[in-house]
Regions:
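A short alpha-helical cap/connector motif
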Residues: 1-139, 145-166, 177-220
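Short glycine-centered segments of the SAM/dcSAM-binding site in methyltransferase folds
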Residues: 168-171
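Walker B catalytic acidic pair
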Residues: 173-175
Length: 220
């Protein structure tokens, strides 16, 4: 069996990339139609969050300079860093809406996330990976997280302890690559959040026992 030549592979790459973009676009369009009127969303909290925050792209004054800074520094960002201004702005809007008392986050080595969190006006603590344990917080953001081996097991154990100590925890997890979905599903199964909002590249997990147990797919 002949192997495809390097030239043929190079010719196929743009077409493969276009197919992936088309697939993502169709997935987003399907979710948009389902979320248009809140179809299937039975949790009042989730319905309000989807329509007031996730689907609302209301601009803030701080967004314009942050977008420009993101554009100029895009090439220097770490591979697992959030690169979409829409995603970073959504995290900012979520914090403005939910107003958690304490925010902790684990960011990529070179990231724009700290700049957006700084503008939120909330007390935010950056946690250094592998050196700082997860103390009780009301909100935790994981832009960068270990995806295999002992490091993932340790993170899972720390998050389980955190959920016990902070029963109303909000956890935002960044899915930097689609192939990490299996690890994320494993983590979700271990932690069993009360409410899950799946936004493709972002997962919002809420552990408040007063919320309606549910899982929804949405777009922003």
């Amino acid at each position: 069996m002949r192997r495809p030549s390097l030239t043929r592979l190079r010719r196929r790459l743009p077409r493969l990339g276009a197919k992936l973009q088309l697939g993502q676009g169709l997935k987003r369009a399907k979710r948009l139609l389902l979320n248009q009127r809140g179809d299937g969303v039975h949790s009042p909290f989730a319905f309000g969050l989807i329509h007031r925050v996730i689907r609302n792209r209301r601009p803030y004054y701080c967004f314009a300079p942050l977008r420009e800074e993101l554009r100029t520094s895009a090439r220097s960002l770490s591979q697992e860093a959030l690169r979409s201004p829409t995603a970073l702005e959504l995290i900012y809007r979520l914090l403005q809406e939910l107003r958690p008392s304490e925010v902790a986050y684990r960011a990529a080595a070179v990231s724009m996330l700290p700049h957006y969190l700084e503008q939120s006006g909330l007390p935010c603590l950056r946690l250094e990976p592998q050196t700082q344990e997860l103390a009780p917080r009301s909100c935790l953001i994981l832009e960068s997280w270990p995806t295999e081996g002992a490091e993932l097991d340790e993170l899972t154990h720390q998050l389980q302890e955190l959920c016990r100590q902070s029963p109303e925890l909000m956890l935002f997890v960044h899915l930097s690559r689609p192939r990490l979905g299996r690890q994320l599903e494993q983590l979700r199964a271990e932690l069993q959040p009360q409410l899950v909002l799946d936004l493709l590249d972002l997962q919002l997990w809420f552990f408040d026992p007063s919320l309606t147990p549910s899982r929804y797919k949405a777009v922003y």
